Amino acid sequence: MTTILKSLPKGENVGIAFSGGLDTSAALLWMKQKGARVFAYTANLGQPDEADYDEIPRKAMEFGAEKARLVDCRSQLVHEGIAAIQSGAFHVSTGGIAYFNTTPLGRAVTGTMLVSAMKEDGVNIWGDGSTYKGNDIERFYRYGLLTNPELRIYKPWLDQQFIDELGGRAEMSAFMTAHGFAYKMSAEKAYSTDSNLLGATHEAKDLEHLDSGIKIVNPIMGVPFWRDDCAVKAETVTVRFEEGQPVALNGQSFADPVALFLEANAIGGRHGLGMSDQIENRIIEAKSRGIYEAPGMALLHIAYERLVTGIHNEDTIEQYRISGMRLGRLLYQGRWFDSQALMLRETAQRWVARAITGEVTLELRRGNDYSIMNTESPNLTYAPERLSMEKVEDAPFTPGDRIGQLTMRNLDIADTRAKLDIFAKAGLLSAGEGSHIPKLENDKG
């Protein structure tokens, strides 16, 4: 059976991920008038730029929906966000500043929870606003079919008739007005924004040009810390984890992870923490550029990784980072619930996160400028007396012990010298001018 429908399935139940904006409003009304029975589903993801969630389903009913549901996805979204922090599932970074995969996390939750709600209502055809050039069309496709194997996909933006009749925002606005729904287009921004409780993504339009930087963005989760007239005072904050779970901020415990995340967003947002400018590779391998906000994710990630480095050994930390890079890419590709991702994620949560108990104190300043002021944990393996430059009682090892350890290194040093001689004879290395250190030759082959 074909899973992607190229034209509107008239007379059938069709679900649409409904945001209440012009695009989905026009699509809903158009599908209704063309003969589909339209069901509208709205995800409450805690979007910081959404004022009234309850109004969105009411709009959908006015535009002709058979049924409109608001699905609260916030708790599940925060659960997945914490899992990403625990497993370090972030593969895109620039200069050590990470993109926290907040949009991929939102799509994983939206794609599964909305399709599950549709299935309850007997709706097995799903449409959303993702375009064919982006990542979301594939993410939603995967998560939708994982949740409901009987699902078929209909996207108005892939239907040539819809494109011919309502090809742009001006046509959509005129269409709504002509049918009694005065819809005044909002002023066009220089970029588009997509957000959820974990973070915000700003991209497209002017931001497609690399000479347009972060300064054209109006933050929705933080402050424009780059502006001289933006007052940002230094602030000390403590973050506490218990067995990998963030449980307290500044001594205040939170039973509800959503409430904790909202407070983390507020604290980090006051400084513009977690904003970054990234060039990334989309699923189809074309590069795109985005400017991201994630104040709460950044705050929790910094504290979590500080405890990771103070508690775990080098090999565990190395594996955590390597696996996190791989897991981050799987998450980005819409494979967060695939077996290979679950394997990496569960391993990190079991063998890394469960040991992460403690408290980290930070001083936040402007943007990503911060200092770590204190680190406390009953599980720390950091012990300054082991390497103290002062004379200590019961030293863990002696000068004689180190002499023996260094002597054992003679074996691999000799092996390395032998290999260098082999490479020199093969013409891959030559003696450095005025130096006994070999240097690489240009590849002649």
Swiss-Prot record:
Main location class: cytoplasm
Reaction catalysed by this enzyme: L-citrulline + L-aspartate + ATP = 2-(N(omega)-L-arginino)succinate + AMP + diphosphate + H(+)
GO cellular component: cytoplasm
Residues involved in L-citrulline binding: 99, 135, 139, 192, 201, 203, 280
Binding locations of ATP: 17-25, 43, 129, 131, 136, 194
Top-level taxon of the source organism: Bacteria
The entry's keywords: Amino-acid biosynthesis, Arginine biosynthesis, ATP-binding, Cytoplasm, Ligase, Nucleotide-binding
GO molecular function: argininosuccinate synthase activity; ATP binding; protein homodimerization activity
PROSITE patterns: ARGININOSUCCIN_SYN_1 (PS00564), ARGININOSUCCIN_SYN_2 (PS00565)
tRNA processing among keywords: no
Annotated family: Belongs to the argininosuccinate synthase family. Type 2 subfamily.
Protein name: Argininosuccinate synthase
